Amino acid sequence: MTIEQNLAQIQQNIQHAVQQAKRPESAVKLLAVSKTKPVEDIYQAYQAGQTAFGENYVQEGVEKIQYFAQKNIPLEWHFIGPLQSNKTKLVAEHFDWMQTLDRKKIADRLNEQRPHYKKPLNVLIQINISDEDSKSGIQPNEMLDLAKQIQNLPHLCLRGLMAIPAPTDDLATQEQAFTQMHSLFEQLKQALPDAQIDTLSMGMTDDMASAIQCGSTMVRIGTAIFGARDYSK
Protein backbone atom coordinates (compact mmCIF):
# COMPACT_ATOMS: atom_id res chain seq x y z
CA MET A 1 0.00 0.00 0.00
CA THR A 2 1.16 3.53 -0.71
CA ILE A 3 1.43 6.31 1.87
CA GLU A 4 -1.65 7.90 0.28
CA GLN A 5 -3.63 4.66 0.66
CA ASN A 6 -2.42 4.22 4.24
CA LEU A 7 -3.52 7.75 5.14
CA ALA A 8 -6.94 7.20 3.60
CA GLN A 9 -7.35 3.98 5.59
CA ILE A 10 -6.33 5.66 8.86
CA GLN A 11 -8.67 8.60 8.29
CA GLN A 12 -11.43 6.07 7.68
CA ASN A 13 -10.54 4.28 10.94
CA ILE A 14 -10.54 7.61 12.81
CA GLN A 15 -13.96 8.53 11.43
CA HIS A 16 -15.35 5.11 12.36
CA ALA A 17 -14.05 5.48 15.94
CA VAL A 18 -15.42 9.05 16.14
CA GLN A 19 -18.86 7.88 15.01
CA GLN A 20 -18.81 4.98 17.49
CA ALA A 21 -18.02 7.49 20.24
CA LYS A 22 -20.83 9.80 19.00
CA ARG A 23 -18.40 12.70 18.69
CA PRO A 24 -18.32 15.44 16.02
CA GLU A 25 -16.72 14.54 12.69
CA SER A 26 -13.81 16.97 13.12
CA ALA A 27 -13.14 16.01 16.77
CA VAL A 28 -9.83 14.21 16.17
CA LYS A 29 -6.73 15.45 14.36
CA LEU A 30 -4.14 13.09 12.86
CA LEU A 31 -0.48 13.74 13.63
CA ALA A 32 1.78 11.81 11.25
CA VAL A 33 4.87 10.65 13.14
CA SER A 34 7.67 11.04 10.62
CA LYS A 35 10.76 10.35 12.75
CA THR A 36 13.51 8.51 10.81
CA LYS A 37 11.48 8.94 7.59
CA PRO A 38 12.92 10.75 4.55
CA VAL A 39 11.54 14.04 3.26
CA GLU A 40 10.24 12.22 0.17
CA ASP A 41 7.82 10.23 2.37
CA ILE A 42 6.68 13.38 4.15
CA TYR A 43 6.10 15.08 0.81
CA GLN A 44 3.97 12.14 -0.35
CA ALA A 45 1.88 12.45 2.81
CA TYR A 46 1.55 16.20 2.25
CA GLN A 47 0.36 15.62 -1.32
CA ALA A 48 -2.29 13.29 0.12
CA GLY A 49 -3.54 16.11 2.37
CA GLN A 50 -1.56 15.57 5.59
CA THR A 51 -0.09 18.79 7.06
CA ALA A 52 0.82 18.02 10.71
CA PHE A 53 3.96 15.99 11.42
CA GLY A 54 5.66 14.80 14.62
CA GLU A 55 9.39 14.43 15.15
CA ASN A 56 11.23 12.82 18.11
CA TYR A 57 14.80 13.91 17.39
CA VAL A 58 15.67 17.61 17.45
CA GLN A 59 18.38 17.79 14.80
CA GLU A 60 16.58 15.53 12.34
CA GLY A 61 13.36 17.47 12.83
CA VAL A 62 15.02 20.85 12.29
CA GLU A 63 16.61 19.67 9.03
CA LYS A 64 13.20 18.58 7.73
CA ILE A 65 11.53 21.82 8.86
CA GLN A 66 14.17 23.86 7.03
CA TYR A 67 13.86 21.70 3.90
CA PHE A 68 10.11 22.29 3.59
CA ALA A 69 10.36 25.96 4.60
CA GLN A 70 12.78 26.54 1.71
CA LYS A 71 10.20 25.03 -0.62
CA ASN A 72 7.43 27.23 0.85
CA ILE A 73 5.42 24.17 1.86
CA PRO A 74 3.39 25.16 4.95
CA LEU A 75 3.55 22.23 7.36
CA GLU A 76 2.85 22.16 11.11
CA TRP A 77 5.66 20.59 13.15
CA HIS A 78 5.26 18.97 16.57
CA PHE A 79 8.16 17.91 18.78
CA ILE A 80 7.09 14.68 20.51
CA GLY A 81 10.31 13.26 21.97
CA PRO A 82 12.07 13.78 25.31
CA LEU A 83 13.88 17.12 25.34
CA GLN A 84 17.19 17.87 27.06
CA SER A 85 17.78 21.43 28.20
CA ASN A 86 20.74 21.89 25.83
CA LYS A 87 18.41 21.32 22.84
CA THR A 88 15.58 23.69 23.81
CA LYS A 89 16.79 26.56 21.61
CA LEU A 90 16.33 24.58 18.39
CA VAL A 91 12.83 23.50 19.40
CA ALA A 92 11.89 27.05 20.42
CA GLU A 93 13.18 28.47 17.16
CA HIS A 94 11.78 25.95 14.68
CA PHE A 95 8.81 23.92 15.93
CA ASP A 96 5.14 24.97 16.15
CA TRP A 97 4.25 22.61 19.00
CA MET A 98 6.12 20.94 21.86
CA GLN A 99 4.11 18.00 23.22
CA THR A 100 6.40 16.61 25.94
CA LEU A 101 6.77 19.45 28.43
CA ASP A 102 7.26 18.10 31.95
CA ARG A 103 9.58 20.53 33.77
CA LYS A 104 9.48 24.21 34.63
CA LYS A 105 13.16 24.54 33.70
CA ILE A 106 12.40 23.45 30.12
CA ALA A 107 9.35 25.73 29.99
CA ASP A 108 11.44 28.71 31.10
CA ARG A 109 14.11 28.01 28.49
CA LEU A 110 11.59 27.55 25.67
CA ASN A 111 9.89 30.80 26.68
CA GLU A 112 13.17 32.74 26.73
CA GLN A 113 14.37 31.24 23.44
CA ARG A 114 11.16 31.51 21.40
CA PRO A 115 11.73 34.24 18.79
CA HIS A 116 9.48 37.22 19.55
CA TYR A 117 8.42 37.56 15.92
CA LYS A 118 6.88 34.07 16.02
CA LYS A 119 3.55 33.12 17.56
CA PRO A 120 3.85 31.64 21.05
CA LEU A 121 5.01 28.01 21.03
CA ASN A 122 2.03 25.69 21.58
CA VAL A 123 2.81 23.29 24.41
CA LEU A 124 1.26 20.19 25.96
CA ILE A 125 2.11 18.88 29.42
CA GLN A 126 3.17 15.23 29.28
CA ILE A 127 1.62 13.09 32.00
CA ASN A 128 3.27 9.81 33.05
CA ILE A 129 -0.13 8.15 33.26
CA SER A 130 1.10 4.56 33.69
CA ASP A 131 3.71 5.60 36.29
CA GLU A 132 6.58 4.02 34.36
CA ASP A 133 10.14 4.76 35.45
CA SER A 134 11.29 4.68 31.84
CA LYS A 135 8.81 7.29 30.63
CA SER A 136 9.06 11.06 30.72
CA GLY A 137 6.16 13.06 32.09
CA ILE A 138 4.95 14.37 35.40
CA GLN A 139 2.68 12.74 37.94
CA PRO A 140 -1.00 13.69 37.65
CA ASN A 141 -0.93 15.54 40.99
CA GLU A 142 1.80 17.87 39.66
CA MET A 143 -0.18 18.96 36.61
CA LEU A 144 -1.91 22.07 37.90
CA ASP A 145 1.21 23.60 39.45
CA LEU A 146 3.14 23.28 36.19
CA ALA A 147 0.15 24.50 34.16
CA LYS A 148 -0.13 27.67 36.24
CA GLN A 149 3.60 28.33 35.86
CA ILE A 150 3.34 27.93 32.08
CA GLN A 151 0.41 30.35 32.01
CA ASN A 152 2.75 33.09 33.22
CA LEU A 153 5.15 32.62 30.28
CA PRO A 154 4.15 34.95 27.41
CA HIS A 155 5.92 33.08 24.60
CA LEU A 156 4.27 29.73 25.40
CA CYS A 157 0.63 28.83 24.83
CA LEU A 158 -0.63 25.92 26.94
CA ARG A 159 -3.01 23.86 24.81
CA GLY A 160 -3.54 20.70 26.87
CA LEU A 161 -2.09 17.31 27.76
CA MET A 162 -0.20 14.42 26.16
CA ALA A 163 0.40 10.83 27.30
CA ILE A 164 2.05 7.61 26.16
CA PRO A 165 0.43 4.88 28.29
CA ALA A 166 2.25 1.58 28.79
CA PRO A 167 1.58 -0.61 25.72
CA THR A 168 -1.04 -3.30 26.33
CA ASP A 169 -3.50 -5.35 24.26
CA ASP A 170 -5.98 -5.35 27.14
CA LEU A 171 -8.78 -2.95 26.25
CA ALA A 172 -9.82 -2.38 29.86
CA THR A 173 -6.28 -1.34 30.82
CA GLN A 174 -6.05 0.95 27.77
CA GLU A 175 -9.34 2.60 28.62
CA GLN A 176 -8.43 3.04 32.27
CA ALA A 177 -5.38 5.13 31.37
CA PHE A 178 -7.20 7.11 28.68
CA THR A 179 -10.21 7.78 30.92
CA GLN A 180 -7.90 9.08 33.64
CA MET A 181 -6.22 11.35 31.08
CA HIS A 182 -9.57 12.72 29.94
CA SER A 183 -10.50 13.44 33.55
CA LEU A 184 -7.23 15.37 34.04
CA PHE A 185 -7.91 17.25 30.79
CA GLU A 186 -11.32 18.34 32.10
CA GLN A 187 -9.75 19.37 35.43
CA LEU A 188 -7.22 21.49 33.57
CA LYS A 189 -9.93 23.24 31.55
CA GLN A 190 -11.90 24.02 34.70
CA ALA A 191 -8.83 25.28 36.58
CA LEU A 192 -7.78 27.59 33.72
CA PRO A 193 -11.03 28.77 32.11
CA ASP A 194 -9.33 31.60 30.21
CA ALA A 195 -6.67 29.37 28.64
CA GLN A 196 -6.95 27.78 25.19
CA ILE A 197 -7.06 24.20 26.50
CA ASP A 198 -8.32 22.19 23.52
CA THR A 199 -5.86 19.37 22.84
CA LEU A 200 -5.63 15.90 24.39
CA SER A 201 -2.89 14.04 22.51
CA MET A 202 -3.18 10.31 23.12
CA GLY A 203 -3.55 7.20 21.04
CA MET A 204 -1.19 5.54 18.58
CA THR A 205 -1.58 2.85 15.91
CA ASP A 206 -2.54 0.01 18.28
CA ASP A 207 -4.76 1.85 20.77
CA MET A 208 -6.25 4.63 18.66
CA ALA A 209 -9.88 3.44 18.88
CA SER A 210 -9.80 3.28 22.70
CA ALA A 211 -8.18 6.72 22.88
CA ILE A 212 -10.84 8.28 20.65
CA GLN A 213 -13.61 6.57 22.63
CA CYS A 214 -12.17 8.17 25.78
CA GLY A 215 -11.91 11.70 24.37
CA SER A 216 -8.60 12.05 22.51
CA THR A 217 -8.45 15.04 20.16
CA MET A 218 -5.14 14.07 18.49
CA VAL A 219 -3.75 10.65 17.60
CA ARG A 220 -0.08 10.11 16.74
CA ILE A 221 0.39 7.56 13.96
CA GLY A 222 3.69 6.57 12.35
CA THR A 223 4.16 2.96 11.27
CA ALA A 224 0.64 2.59 9.85
CA ILE A 225 1.31 5.55 7.53
CA PHE A 226 4.97 5.21 6.61
CA GLY A 227 5.70 1.53 7.29
CA ALA A 228 8.24 0.10 9.75
CA ARG A 229 11.00 2.50 10.83
CA ASP A 230 14.64 2.03 9.97
CA TYR A 231 16.64 2.99 13.08
CA SER A 232 19.99 2.11 11.49
CA LYS A 233 20.29 5.49 9.76
UniProtKB/Swiss-Prot annotation:
The name on file for this protein is Pyridoxal phosphate homeostasis protein
Q: Spell out the HAMAP family in the cross-references.
A: PLP_homeostasis
Q: List the disulfide bonds.
A: none
CDD domains the record matches: PLPDE_III_Yggs_like (cd06824)
A matching Pfam family: Ala_racemase_N
Q: Quote the InterPro entries the UniProt record gives.
A: Ala_racemase_N, PLP-binding_barrel, PyrdxlP_homeostasis
One function term, GO molecular function aspect: pyridoxal phosphate binding
Q: Which NCBIfam families match?
A: YggS family pyridoxal phosphate-dependent enzyme
UniProt keywords, alphabetically:
Pyridoxal phosphate
Q: Which residues are modified to N6-(pyridoxal phosphate)lysine?
A: K35
**What domain of life does the native source organism fall in?**
Bacteria
Q: What job does this protein perform?
A: Pyridoxal 5'-phosphate (PLP)-binding protein, which is involved in PLP homeostasis.
Which family, according to UniProt? Belongs to the pyridoxal phosphate-binding protein YggS/PROSC family.
